[in-house]
């Protein structure tokens, strides 16, 4: 019997030593020890952690092993003679932030990070060395990995306004980001289509603003609706009674997160070293807010309703009044938001505001006159600067979509460039941090294929285009390029109604994004990435992720 077991282990060791190491994102350096036996994880393997700050990484690994391999390991401070996974923090191993070394032998695994973050990222690479099938011997190939991130900001966004997703799925989404070494989660909490965060001072935001009476059927403009021009251009308001009649499915949709639930999600993300950036949209995209508090609009006597169709709702006037009353309201909202979220960054939107409504508002015109503002673009800048001053007074920094450049950029603002790269380039040239998220490649709600399997936004962002995106524009010199903080994928949910559809739209484009942001530029190779994806897909099968399987056809 012993001889049979020995031969079995020898066969396993040859199989593992010969296997390819397919990690996404691609590490900076990998040395495969092809002649060495694998490290075998069994019930006697221990996770060694002497530094208490590394416990979250140990717990994450242990939870993963238990969930997918039905194996729970002992966590200890004492290093045994062999058969252990040791987590260590040592700032001297690399000049790079959040770097790590990962060394596996047949006796043990040693993970050394320059920080607790680096250790956590090493754990994610270690997980990708595990078998993609649960019911077999858990072997890890002998390897040395030396790695570090390329960009400091590695972000992913989720819109929960157009369609609401519960706490359990938001946590799952955060796990997806963690497994891909992402470190920022942009949580789009408010928009025309629903207000999703409890604000205790203003309960009607969730009593009224969190619910809509229906959603259009199919692609915009929706089944039975005319393709009306609904985006207001400067000096142009053409709206008829028929424009306001929208046919929908008549199904009430909504939901919101209580502040206690927000805290629960924040705690969950913190243990995965992901910073959550909340977005509170202003001055436009405010139909849900105005449905609850119409007095804050430029037409205070109008009956607003939470939006039931997609796209920009500025034809129906979704812009907040530029008044002291509005500013005080927003300050109170942001106070509660900032008290909840430890993030040093607060996203305040700033996009797609139809300034024509300010042009026709006596109150807004008076605000312009009182502050020496000549144009409505300057009023937008004043609006953003005023909110920035308040946010800065609380020790935090604002992020805004690239429209916040209009009329002059607020002094400390970070620009999120979605309308191509122009906004990011302009911000970097003004010595402001920029996050690149151009919609043609970074919007994962777009179709992945010319003929999609299911309903998706009528734009095309295939995997190869995502993978080949380079966040640093060639127009910038070396000094300006330092202000490109990183990039972000965005997932808008007009046509994404279930967790399975989120997964389908996200994977494998999130894999491509992670490699853009983590791996050295000279390590990126699309054919090699495609090869590594085959192993990643097997892992997704193990995890029950509904990825886009059409990529397996190629």
In which residue ranges do the predicted regions lie?
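Bacterial Sec-dependent N-terminal signal peptides
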Residues: 1-22
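Acidic, contiguous N-terminal accessory segments
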Residues: 16-154, 392-394, 398-401, 405, ...
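Feature activates predominantly on carbohydrate-active enzymes
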Residues: 52, 94-317, 322-327, 331, ...
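Flexible loop/turn segments at secondary-structure boundaries
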Residues: 56, 164-166, 192-198, 283-289, ...
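Structural detector of well-ordered beta-strand residues that form the stable sheet scaffold
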Residues: 186-188, 277, 347, 399, ...
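Active-site neighborhood of glycoside hydrolase catalytic domains
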Residues: 289-295, 299, 307-414, 418-430
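Flexible, acidic glycine-rich loops studded with aromatic residues
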Residues: 397-403, 408-413, 419-554
């Amino acid at each position: 019997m012993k001889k049979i077991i020995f031969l079995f282990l020898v066969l396993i060791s040859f199989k593992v030593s010969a296997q390819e190491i397919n990690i996404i994102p691609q590490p900076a350096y990998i040395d495969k020890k092809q002649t060495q036996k694998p490290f075998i994880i069994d019930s006697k393997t221990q996770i060694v952690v002497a530094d208490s700050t590394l416990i979250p990484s140990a717990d994450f690994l242990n939870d993963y092993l238990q969930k997918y391999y039905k194996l729970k390991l002992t966590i200890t401070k004492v290093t045994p003679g062999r058969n252990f996974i040791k987590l260590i923090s040592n700032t001297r191993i690399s000049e790079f932030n959040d770097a790590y070394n990962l060394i596996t032998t047949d006796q043990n695994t040693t993970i050394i990070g320059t920080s607790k973050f680096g250790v956590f990222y090493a754990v994610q690479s270690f997980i990708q060395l595990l078998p993609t099938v649960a019911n077999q011997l858990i072997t890890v190939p002998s390897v040395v990995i030396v790695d570090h991130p390329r960009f400091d900001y590695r972000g992913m966004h989720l819109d929960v306004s157009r369609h609401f997703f519960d706490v359990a799925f938001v946590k799952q989404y955060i796990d997806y980001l963690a497994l891909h070494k992402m470190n920022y989660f942009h949580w789009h909490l408010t928009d025309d289509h629903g207000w999703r965060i409890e604000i205790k001072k203003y309960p009607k935001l969730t009593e009224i603003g969190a619910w809509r009476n229906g959603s259009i059927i199919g692609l915009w403009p929706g089944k039975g609706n005319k393709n009306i021009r609904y985006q207001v251009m400067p000096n142009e308001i053409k709206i008829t009674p028929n424009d306001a009649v929208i046919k929908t499915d008549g199904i009430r949709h909504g939901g919101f997160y209580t502040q206690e639930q927000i805290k629960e999600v924040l705690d969950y993300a913190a243990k995965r070293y992901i910073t959550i950036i909340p977005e509170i949209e202003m001055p436009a995209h405010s139909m849900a807010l105005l449905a609850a508090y119409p007095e804050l609009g430029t037409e205070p006597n109008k009956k607003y309703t939470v939006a039931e169709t997609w796209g920009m709702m500025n034809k129906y006037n979704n812009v907040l009044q530029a008044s002291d009353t509005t500013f005080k309201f927003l300050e109170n909202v942001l106070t509660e938001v900032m008290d909840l979220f430890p993030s040093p960054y607060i996203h305040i939107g700033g996009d797609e505001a139809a300034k024509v409504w300010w042009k026709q508002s006596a109150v807004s015109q008076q605000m312009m006159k009182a502050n020496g503002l000549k144009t409505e673009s300057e009023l937008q800048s004043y609006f953003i600067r005023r909110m920035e001053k308040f946010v800065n007074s609380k020790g935090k920094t604002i992020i805004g979509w690239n429209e916040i450049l209009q009329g002059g950029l607020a002094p400390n603002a970070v620009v999120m460039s979605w309308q191509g790269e122009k906004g990011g380039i302009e911000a970097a040239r003004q010595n402001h941090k920029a996050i690149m998220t151009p919609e043609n490649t970074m919007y994962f709600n777009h179709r992945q294929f010319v003929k999609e399997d299911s309903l998706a936004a009528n734009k095309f962002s295939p995997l190869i285009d995502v993978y080949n995106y380079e966040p640093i524009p060639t127009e910038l010199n070396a000094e300006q390029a330092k202000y490109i903080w990183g990039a972000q994928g965005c997932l808008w949910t007009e046509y994404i109604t279930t967790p399975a559809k989120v997964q389908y739209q996200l994977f494998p484009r999130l894999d491509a994004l992670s490699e853009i942001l983590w791996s050295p530029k000279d390590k990126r190779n699309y054919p090699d990435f495609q090869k590594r994806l085959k192993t990643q897909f097997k892992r997704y099968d193990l995890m029950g992720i509904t990825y886009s399987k059409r990529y397996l056809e190629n």
